[in-house]
């Protein structure tokens, strides 16, 4: 079945309604531990069961790295990013993984979320190996599959880059098709879409079959002022959590870094994780392992100057979908520990 171009609501900008809060509150009640057994060091993290975050979380739990650093990590399964956002706002979980641009936007709107690095991996823009599309300018009039919806950070970075360097508005000059990444991969392989903007882990199987990266997202980020080694994704939690769980930012960061150290060097650990990775071939397995390792950031906080430059570039391009109306980095976005 061929997908039709359509628009969906900006879920990042969508206000959290009373109904959504009630639903999340119900989830919180179901997930809450009994009062007597609920200790202050229990941290609930919302994650997709099959996402790349699950690999790191499983490593933390398998090796007891949470307990080693003084807390207990509890996994709360979620269906998607919007669900995680709502659960965090409602107190149904303590930690989610998202980008610091979203955190800055939420802080400008009165939230108290903070960010510590998780991964510097971002998406890929791919075309078929024999495609006539050679540059972003060739996407005019083409159908582009986009995973994550209109607020996907990689899609917005590409659009901002196209406006800045080529005066092209891909939102108007091309047809965007928003769908789940697995479905988009199928549509791409059936030639129902001309290009695909998808998450890094879904790009590797396509690359293995010859798909060509139209432009490197690291080059896009660099042009927009962001150091490509600056992680966009991170663990996000409220300052209130940091106050009630002493040193949690440091503890969580150390557990994450310890897990990444294992995943960076231990081949046996990846063999253990393979059932979680939903891969059918050794080639895909090796590609995903290499991709995760390539996304491991330095054990430092993002460069605030580079972050400001990126937000300014988004402002100049007119993109408010991701950053909101305020083009400055909100004070306190990056956790201090």
Model-flagged regions — what are they?
Residues 243-318:
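Secondary-structure end/capping motifs
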Residues 64, 92, 97, 107, ...:
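Sec/Tat-exported extracytoplasmic proteins
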